[in-house]
Amino acid sequence: KEFRVLHTTYAPGGQNPKHYHPSHVVFYVLEGSGVWQEEGKDPVTLKPGESLHVRPGMVHAHRNASTTEQLVFLEFVIVDKGQRSTVPMR
């Protein structure tokens, strides 16, 4: 297994379309405001210091809620060595 920490920055209005992760993922916001939406659930807005757990296989999308400020967050994931941590939806 590998423990990965991804440091991600979205420009104002930036987004990641629907996708899923093959393992548990925890998102932690460092700067800005982001909206995460799991399929079939209401959207959740996260601000600095807040986190969200996403279960394996849960289809979701996330975006920067601001049109003027960047969104910066950490993504914590444990995967099998060599395994992709994100699978896009087609």
Feature-to-residue mapping (PLM):
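Conserved hydrophobic/aromatic beta-strand scaffold that supports enzyme active sites
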Residues: 5-7, 26, 51-53, 75-76
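Extracellular/periplasmic catalytic domains that process cell-envelope and extracellular macromolecules
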Residues: 20, 28, 45, 65-70
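Glycine- and acidic-residue-biased ligand/ion/polar-headgroup-sensing regions
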Residues: 22-40, 48-50
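Short beta-strand His + acidic residue motifs that chelate non-heme Fe in jelly-roll/DSBH
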Residues: 18, 36-37, 60-67
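Short, solvent-exposed loop/turn elements at domain surfaces
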Residues: 15-19, 37, 84-86
